[in-house]
Amino acid sequence: MNACASASSLHSLSPAVAPQEPYLLEVLNVSKGFPGVVALANVQLRVRPGTVLALMGENGAGKSTLMKIIAGIYQPDSGELRLKGRPVTFATPLAALQAGIAMIHQELNLMPHMSIAENIWIGREQQNRLGLIDHREMHRCTAALLARLRIELDPEEQVGNLSIAERQMVEIAKAVSYDSDVLIMDEPTSAITDKEVAHLFSIIADLKAQGKGIVYITHKMNEVFAIADEVAVFRDGAYIGLQRADSLDGDSLISMMVGRELSQLFPLREKPIGELLLKVRDLRLDGVFKGVSFDLHAGEILGIAGLMGSGRTNVAETLFGITPSDGGEIVLDGQPLRIGDPHRAIEKGLALLTEDRKLSGLFPCLSVLENMEVAVLPHYAGGGFVQQKALRALCEDMCRKLRVKTPSLEQCIDTLSGGNQQKALLARWLMTQPRILILDEPTRGIDVGAKAEIYRLIASLAGEGMAVIMISSELPEVLGMSDRVMVMHEGQLMGTLDRNEATQERVMQLASGLN
């Protein structure tokens, strides 16, 4: 089937034909190790046609490692994969794709300087009679695919100009374009809005009707019970079990995942009464946001809520000097402050954990140690020498405090799970000893156990007098952690709510532009 034909197969959804084999995909006793770490130990998994299998587990449980084995990125040390009952081995991701397995990665893998059409059909470009790439035909195929998926994007738009949510939809379109029997979705909703989640779920329902098998990795309980037929749980590299989704509730699923009962997810805190640290008045960035005013006190957690495109992240980046403001006033410790670049912000005690760790946080080719030390390196260097022993001791201490799971500090950070990468980045900024910590989506892609750890850490930092600004798309997180909640809509501050008046209904009302 050619590229356009595979795309058009979504157009008419005929009832799935029951296959002779009971399973599309089987994983039998697969093991995989890395230096100093057993990532998988004799795990198993089975995917039925026309079903969604949710794969759950804490960060480091082995979920992503197994998916990379299925997708041909890693090779297993032992065990067997079967596709429609036949043993298979995939030496490369291309081999897995050609066999009918497509994967949507948690960290998006698109070419930013290429168009949407070029990204979707890369390696499968339509050619004309002269053997040249037929850009017109590629455009037509892409437009047809996007239309059938109800994705409103221009096929010729450069991917680098898209939002994270739009890039995620392009990844989904690309995976669907292969007409694969098995689709692996690794945290597909981590960066998209509730409306786009509903859109994705409708696409998944269409794929189920065609007899496709979906492996759906997520940390969001509500999604599991909304979309999954079965749930498989991994813990510490081991397969714990598989159950029908309708036979589980949230507490039993969490218990399977973490091997223990979780205490209250959001720590109980008394509202702090600290000194005024930061005063912002009428802050604006032309064409992006305007009229943003707020106060921030020591020991306070200020949440910022809003839909995607509301300007939340832009406010954080302006406060940190990434995009200097076009007007307004920032006052720190009673003194007017102009923050023209991140170096100035760090000097004044600000730190920013960005929303996209791959794009603007990690140095993927460097070690855990090198990624953690980069923000404090100037303080440990002088006279042509670096105080390596002191730096290592500091990084080791932060790894222990934040429970960063890594075989060693020399390990390439790109090999860690998403949650451990996030904790390493948080450690980087805590080593600068900030007075104001700005967190943009701090628990995106992190499992429920790790979330509880992050929440306790944030509460502890606030209890020690640190001021925290927390941006999040998860309303329970904003409401559960914040002393006050700012709500933005299309670049405007709609209101600031105290904890006792901040409800999901009221926040969503303001986030939608309704007073």
UniProtKB/Swiss-Prot annotation:
EC number of the protein: 7.5.2.11, 7.5.2.7
UniProt keyword annotation of Repressor present: no
Gene3D superfamilies in UniProt: P-loop containing nucleotide triphosphate hydrolases
GO molecular function, a single term: ABC-type D-ribose transporter activity
Compartments, as annotated in UniProt: Cell inner membrane
Pfam families: ABC_tran
Signal peptide location: none
First-listed, main subcellular location of the protein, grouped into a coarse class: membrane
InterPro entries tied to this protein: AAA+_ATPase, ABC_carbohydrate_import_ATPase, ABC_transporter-like_ATP-bd, ABC_transporter-like_CS, P-loop_NTPase
UniProt similarity note: Belongs to the ABC transporter superfamily. Carbohydrate importer 2 (CUT2) (TC 3.A.1.2) family.
Function: Part of an ABC transporter complex involved in carbohydrate import. Could be involved in ribose, galactose and/or methyl galactoside import. Responsible for energy coupling to the transport system.
Protein name: Putative ribose/galactose/methyl galactoside import ATP-binding protein
Organism expressing this protein natively: Pseudomonas fluorescens (strain ATCC BAA-477 / NRRL B-23932 / Pf-5)
